[in-house]
């Protein structure tokens, strides 16, 4: 098999597909190579949360952040493996990536003011606000292409339904304590399949 492309992306997880979308939006011919028979990479197994300090939605959810605090946190977490140049590049590019996808694609994100850093009490850590997740969508919109996607880990599902966004998770956790949540969960379960 021979083909020409401007950009060859290795892997179909979030990073690979994000690179492919960005390159295509820039007018380049893109090919994605995936070693597995299904798309999604390890992102499909992880639940899909992204750790993005200073993302554009932090103001909306009432969270203040700074590049300095995020870098301090990463220095504390990484120790000897801390690479200031890479950390700076990540902290500058990650919020722009969120803006790009929100503006240029159908991908939208939800932020959580209560989803903490792994070690929120560490220097520069936050009790919430840095993590975002792609907003849930109805997989049936993909038709037969849905079968091309790697299924999430069973531990991340309820009756085979991926509980993706923070808002959905809250409803599933509160189904027995809130009529609104019970109704939401019932609709989700009845609409599945």
Short names for language-model regions:
Residues 1-4:
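A short, basic/flexible loop-to-alpha-helix module at the beginning of a structural domain
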Residues 6-32:
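N-terminal Rossmann-like FAD-binding beta1-loop-alpha1 element of flavoenzymes
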Residues 35-193:
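Conserved N-terminal/central alpha/beta ligand/cofactor-binding core
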